[in-house]
Amino acid sequence: MSTQFRKSNHNSHSSKKLNPALKSKIDTLTELFPDWTSDDLIDIVQEYDDLETIIDKITSGAVTRWDEVKKPAKKEKYEKKEQQHSYVPQQHLPNPEDDITYKSSNNSNSFTSTKHNSSNNYTQARNKKKVQTPRAHTTGKHVNLDKGKHVPSKPVSNTTSWAAAVSVDTKHDVPQDSNDNNNEELEAQGQQAQENQEKEQEEQQQQEGHNNKEEHKQIEQPSLSSKKTTSKTSAPQPKKMSWAAIATPKPKAVKKTESPLENVAELKKEISDIKKDDQKSEASEEKVNEQETSAQEQEEETAEPSEENEDRVPEVDGEEVQEEAEEKEQVKEEEQTAEELEQEQDNVAAPEEEVTVVEEKVEISAVISEPPEDQANTVPQPQQQQQQQQQQPQQPQQQQQQPQQQQQPQQPQQQLQQQQQQQQQPVQAQAQAQEEQLSQNYYTQQQQQQFAQQQHQFQQQYLSQQQQYAQQQQQHPQPQSQQPQSQQSPQSQKQGNNVAAQQYYMYQNQFPGYSYPGMFDSQGYAYGQQYQQLAQNNAQTSGNANQYNFQQGYGQAGANTAAANLTSAAAAAAASPATAHAQPQQQQPYGGSFMPYYAHFYQQSFPYGQPQYGVAGQYPYQLPKNNYNYYQTQNGQEQQSPNQGVAQHSEDSQQKQSQQQQQQQPQGQPQPEVQMQNGQSVNPQQQMQFQQYYQFQQQQQQAAAAAAAAAQQGVPYGYNGYDYNSKNSRGFY
């Protein structure tokens, strides 16, 4: 009795102080958990504010009703009274006493009917939340605890709010838990089925009796095991539909990988078969038997053509060999790329097609129906380009070791081929190539900038590496013909170093800020010559200006082109945009001045310094904005932001050029000299070093320049608008 008394006492004094918010929560909770009274819920609602947490606690069993366990025997007195009313659902309202009587009742009819009805309407909805029995019942007689999934103890109240709550639950929960592709159909079906069920159950409740028990167990177990949480009638349907949706693509995806990609005719047959099957399967989605047969047919059909394919492989390879023979007549080098590309095409195109098969069946025809030869030209364009780049550094080596008479007839052919390839490349490939080329061919570009007429023709020369090599082949005979034969060996050696350096730094571009510890210790990166390299290269770009040692002021940044026009006045209009564009390639990330080791160590080679301009953790490695160099170079214009680009950089480097040319030119170098057109002497060893240095430096600079351009134009990339010296930010780290 003590518990009874406590309960009623608690009831009376708590109902007075209920505020409306608590009351609404308790109402919703009693609808969700019909066997919990408001008395049971009051404490929980007062303890936890949030409805969701309360529901979680109750469903997970973390919270249990305090009085439930203690008096099982008392409640049995009430069962016989309640059983008389149990069949009339309209009068049957949620009531804790009823609930307990049902648990312990021995009358199988009343028990099964309530169990049947409640489990359909309610526990199916609860199962969506994957609920275990909410609390530990110790009454010995309730049957269903061992199922673990649904709670038997709920009485049926078919009041409208209750049914509405259930249907709302199913509406929200079905799409989350059901794994089918047909969520929307299922929602509609689930709702209809539930409404129908509730009506039927109200009518048929009294008639159904024991049969219900068996049916219910049979139906519920599969739906529980598959976690299909829709109601009974709709539970098998999603299973069938999802089974069809899952089963039909599988044979396609598996068979596709087996069949070789070259056999276009066979693939077309397969595609037509698959389309037919898709139409069948769409027509017969509800009819499972037809689905199964079509899936089997499909497996057989896809199995047959793949076998035929494997038989037909040798024939098709024969055809491809003929096509390749035709290609050999046109261009010799394309033979290699074509073969490599076909191999790569198998690797590249196979996974793509596999994916398209699974996702959208119809698109396969678009992908496959192109003949593989076209794909060899169109699909992996960037790969073709990379192969070209790897071949071409080797070609100049061979050509320059040959006598010059052989060299010149080969050039027109090679340039033809390169122009063809340039036409093939899509814009993406060019964009990708741009990074690699810029770094690879700096030296040749310097030479090209002397030939202003050619600049006019190829203003976009640094977009296509192939053309640069072609032009280099054209230009080299001119200086070479003025030289003794002994000059060829250092130049071919220089080309070899070009290739080696390119491969050495090849991956620098992909991880712009990354470098490995020994990077600057290598022979290829000569610190002693860096000033000379800078000087020489910029001397070439800026024409004769620095030969006469006049300093170019800030306003004269454009005078690079003016100086170049002393030698070739004709091309002034063409040259000025081209050189202006060419300038940022040479710009140095650390503000024009060239500190050999430390600047590299911090600004360049560590992952912190480079590409992120000013993310908070990296301040120590960046020089502050306002006077960028810590030490002032000759002109006080260093205050610009680091990559302000063309003007500032060309200035600084030209000052250094002018100083170093004063040192170099009086000393007149004894080695054989390449006479550039502007008459400036360049020693081949220096050329080698320019090249290696610039290839590396440019890859670093492109990343830096991109980041800096984004940062300086106010793109929000990191913190970069931060003023390190202002009073506000003084105590920042």
UniProtKB/Swiss-Prot annotation:
Residues 21-63 form the CUE domain. GO terms for cellular component: chromosome, telomeric region; cytoplasm; nucleus. Ubiquitinated. The keyword Oxidoreductase does not apply. Residues 297-327, 336-357 have a biased composition (Acidic residues). Residues 69-84, 210-219, 255-290 have a biased composition (Basic and acidic residues). GO terms for biological process: DNA repair. Its main location: cytoplasm. The keyword Cytoplasm applies. Residues 103-121, 222-240, 380-446, 465-495, 655-677 have a biased composition (Low complexity). The modification Phosphoserine is found at S259, S272, S306, S641. Residues 69-446, 465-498, 635-682 are annotated as: Disordered. Keywords: Chromosome, Cytoplasm, DNA damage, DNA repair, DNA-binding, Nucleus, Phosphoprotein, Telomere, Ubl conjugation, Ubl conjugation pathway. CDD domains: CUE_DEF1_like (cd14368). Residues 495-525 are annotated as: Contains the proteolytic activation cleavage site. GO terms for molecular function: DNA binding; ubiquitin binding. Belongs to the DEF1 family. This is RNA polymerase II degradation factor 1. It comes from Saccharomyces cerevisiae (strain YJM789).
